[in-house]
């Protein structure tokens, strides 16, 4: 009987370990949006701040970081390389944003970025990501234009 209990314990431990690994792998996977981009890469719905920092350090022409806060807030400090398109004016300026460009949208805490992302979707944009708020940016901000 003791042998059976040990076997069940070992099997339970193995199953628990496999389940834990599965959850970790699933959590690390991102859901993708849009079609293949440069070199077959696609824009995910979520990237870590460190990944965005790498993008800032090595900008790609087909990926724009869009700040939808007020121009005043943008001037006071924004993610380097971000372009200012305040939420109140972005929809009237869509002619400036190529529809096939990947867009990473952020605001102060995330609410306005979510709203703008939904508007972009309605306008036909498929390659966008609501990054949330500037508070997630841990590094030095750029000021001015």
Regions found by a protein language model. Give the residues of each.
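Structural scaffold elements adjacent to functional motifs in cytosolic proteins
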Residues: 65-67
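Short, surface-exposed ligand- or partner-binding patches at beta-edge/loop junctions that are enriched
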Residues: 106-107
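N-terminal leader/targeting signatures
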Residues: 15-18
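Rhodanese-like catalytic fold shared by cysteine-dependent sulfurtransferases
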Residues: 2-13, 24-53, 59-63, 72-102, ...
């Amino acid at each position: 009987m003791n042998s059976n209990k040990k076997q069940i314990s070992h099997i339970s431990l193995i199953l628990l370990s496999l389940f834990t690994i599965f959850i970790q792998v699933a959590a690390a996977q991102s859901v993708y949006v849009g079609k293949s981009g440069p070199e077959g890469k696609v824009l995910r719905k979520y990237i870590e701040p460190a990944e965005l920092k790498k993008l800032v350090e090595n900008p790609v022409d087909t990926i724009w970081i869009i700040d939808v806060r007020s121009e005043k807030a943008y001037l006071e400090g924004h993610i380097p390389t971000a372009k200012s398109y305040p939420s109140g004016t972005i929809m009237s300026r869509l002619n400036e944003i190529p529809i096939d460009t990947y867009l990473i949208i952020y605001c102060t805490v995330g609410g306005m970025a979510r709203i703008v992302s939904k508007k972009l979707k309605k306008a036909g944009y498929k390659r966008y990501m609501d990054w949330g708020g500037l508070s997630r940016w841990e590094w030095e901000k750029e000021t001015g234009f």
